[in-house]
Amino acid sequence: MHAKSLTELRAALAAKECSAVELAQHYLKRIDAARDLNAFVHVDADLTLAQAKAADAELARGAGGALTGLPIAHKDVFVTRGWRSTAGSKMLANYESPFDATVVARLQAAGMVTLGKTNMDEFAMGSSNENSAFGAVKNPWDTNAVPGGSSGGSSAAVAARLAPAATGTDTGGSIRQPASFAGVTGIKPTYGRVSRYGMIAFASSLDQGGPMAQSASDCALLLNAMAGFDERDSTSLERDDEDFTRHLGQPWAAGNDAGKPLAGLRIGLPNEYFGAGLADDVRATIDAALKQYEALGATLVPVSLPKTELSIPVYYVIAPAEASSNLSRFDGVRFGHRAAQYGDLLDMYKKSRAEGFGPEVKRRILVGTYVLSHGYYDAYYLQAQKIRRIIANDFQEAFKSCDVIMGPASPTVAWDLGAKGDDPVQMYLADIYTLSVSLAGLPGMSVPCGFGAGANAQRPVGLQIIGNYFNEARMLQVADAFQRATDWHKQVPAGV
């Protein structure tokens, strides 16, 4: 049962081959048996089965929609009533929210059944899921490797088939990079497309929620429920509702030959994504995927994104600056861990934050406070914002000659657990291909397209697909065409 995609599970429920309760029980058993992966931080079988029973009642009445009764796991950055909501931090280790995040509420309203909360890098700050207060997550493909981050628990859960789908968030690549490392499909929508209400904030001008699942078609189904205007989120964009599945299985242009469904599609290949720093095995795998697109009728077009390298320093000025402000609320008074012993109020603030936050979060708070301080604001923060606008303009220039942009989601396959923990700069460099997309607010996704070579032969590679603003439906169409022609997204780790 767990090998089935969301679409296949929906058909199984409709045909009464299984019930929502049976589905939930099956996945709960798998989660319990795979505790060593550490993908989940909180599971409550009673809450899950109660939701499943309600879904079965809906289905029995002939009601319900496309997602009714289907299980999903939520990244622990989305507050979820009934489950703990920790953001992977000791600071919120015992926090229980009195309300659901909009993303959670919409998926529950669509009839989905929550399996539990997935592990993550603390406050979504990290690229390996080693920064969690609840321990590192292991990659199901190779348990000596990281699953990516910060949505590593979600990517590992979907890869190990502990859940058919999961929510994630992406600030600088935290859906796309773990999707690449774990061999699953994940999409970061256009900034403002999915509500941030109830999503514990890291960097408010960058954070965006999105789905992770086996396939592009599954992600499209989930995005139908997740996306939409929310008046409680000041960054939410008012757009007409759309069906993200509407182009799936359709030719790129009317009249295309069945063997060349993507004829007319122009794929931009940034020179900067294929230069120094890209591992040879990743390059070979991406090249093979691009040849598959050519076989489907697409045309490859060279483009340039000249400020790609600057995306790293720009991101690591802007994101920590916003984080230092957002995380100031966690002081042990109203929110977060409070030190057991302290002398006065100031001492309580110091000790509570020192005990509650992990090393990477402290590092970014310090960086953010520095770049916002008097004398440095103009030199760092304002300059970073100017370059951010240039990066966004570079993408618009590139889209004049192509419909989508493609390249690797990460310069390497997943690295070994502990390999980069002592060198944060090396960890930051792993996001070079995803950061600029986030800075521009564009939609991007990663789809499985093969594996590394040699010692990395069991470590997945993801192809990144980047679209222009609000072009998710076309991006999903392009990804779906690739997945109809290949089976990389159907492959699973040994033993699964």
Swiss-Prot record:
The keyword Transmembrane does not apply. It comes from the Bacteria. One of its GO terms (cellular component) is glutamyl-tRNA(Gln) amidotransferase complex. Transmembrane segments: none annotated. Keywords: ATP-binding, Ligase, Nucleotide-binding, Protein biosynthesis. It catalyses: L-glutamyl-tRNA(Gln) + L-glutamine + ATP + H2O = L-glutaminyl-tRNA(Gln) + L-glutamate + ADP + phosphate + H(+). Pfam families: Amidase. Its EC number is 6.3.5.7. The active site is at K75 (charge relay system), S150 (charge relay system), S174 (acyl-ester intermediate). Gene3D superfamilies: Amidase signature (AS) domain. GO terms for molecular function: ATP binding; glutaminyl-tRNA synthase (glutamine-hydrolyzing) activity. GO terms for biological process: translation. Heterotrimer of A, B and C subunits. Allows the formation of correctly charged Gln-tRNA(Gln) through the transamidation of misacylated Glu-tRNA(Gln) in organisms which lack glutaminyl-tRNA synthetase. The reaction takes place in the presence of glutamine and ATP through an activated gamma-phospho-Glu-tRNA(Gln). Belongs to the amidase family. GatA subfamily. This is Glutamyl-tRNA(Gln) amidotransferase subunit A. It comes from Burkholderia cenocepacia (strain ATCC BAA-245 / DSM 16553 / LMG 16656 / NCTC 13227 / J2315 / CF5610) (Burkholderia cepacia (strain J2315)). The lineage of its organism: Bacteria, Pseudomonadati, Pseudomonadota, Betaproteobacteria, Burkholderiales.
